């Protein structure tokens, strides 16, 4: 006789909620839309992580890198060391504690400060680009100063995240009241293999790249070791961190477009490559041979953003959901259509992309810039 099936209703490995919205005209708006979308998907999280990334929020300091730094357990020795480190390696034009609402429903929040800085390169480091210099210094803080973590490091943008439901984190950082941006991404976390702690909440960020992720990256070990060869080190105890560093390496440092990066993360199966025409077969074989360590295995969906553009993509067989919608200049990506319709009921278009195919939204100014670059190449 077969045994009785045991159902564990509290064991759910298919959760996490993702949302992203960009106004392609560049119009800035508050975080309320992203907050309400995440409230609609509250059942996708369990209160152990929520967060937002916002772009265009610091126009008065838009030419400076905005470092959001988290000090675990309010470690003032760590803060003192970070202050000294930044003074030695950057020109700090302004620094302050990030304003918060102490009445918000969050547990044991750490200390958050923001620093607006420009690089102060010396010696051989003068050979580095400003971006490479900032990445190097962020890695030094995250790996060498205990209890200090740089959670975002781009210009005119910031990440706000922590332990709680997304609406709790939004209330804590006062995102609806204090900030306006032209693009927002958001995440509701349901941790499965890693702890629910403030640094492990999404988004993950390096420079202005941010990633929110639903799923499980079973190739994390291989991805992590490959990225370490290029100076990227994972310190935040979750697999998603590799995605932020991978897009920085591939798109910023190596100059690959989203369309090719999507095929590195989610390439065609070998049996599909075998039946392609010769040109495509050579192309995809070269991608898989050269970038095999950055193939992302497992069930996953990600929304990636940087200044001027955002894209969402799933694994090649869509084991985690993503849906997109458009209304005028607004482009949405989300784990659920219901979240999009909760904030924009009258959509012009709704569609679900194929597995491994990116949904891309760009500022109109960015589209014109890319078109000009393409015409110059041709």
Curated annotation (Swiss-Prot):
Keyword Calcium appears in the UniProt entry: no
Organism of derivation: Archaeoglobus fulgidus (strain ATCC 49558 / DSM 4304 / JCM 9628 / NBRC 100126 / VC-16)
Keyword Zinc appears in the UniProt entry: no
CDD domains for the chain: GlxB (cd01907)
Pfam families xrefs: GATase_2
Alphabetized PROSITE patterns for the sequence: GATASE_TYPE_2
Residue ranges constituting the Glutamine amidotransferase type-2 domain according to the UniProt record: 16-378
Record: active site: 16 (for gatase activity)
Keywords: Glutamine amidotransferase
Protein name: Uncharacterized protein AF_0952
InterPro entries in the cross-refs: GATase_2_dom (IPR017932), Glu_synth_lsu_1 (IPR012375), Ntn_hydrolases_N (IPR029055)
Sequence intervals crossing the membrane: none
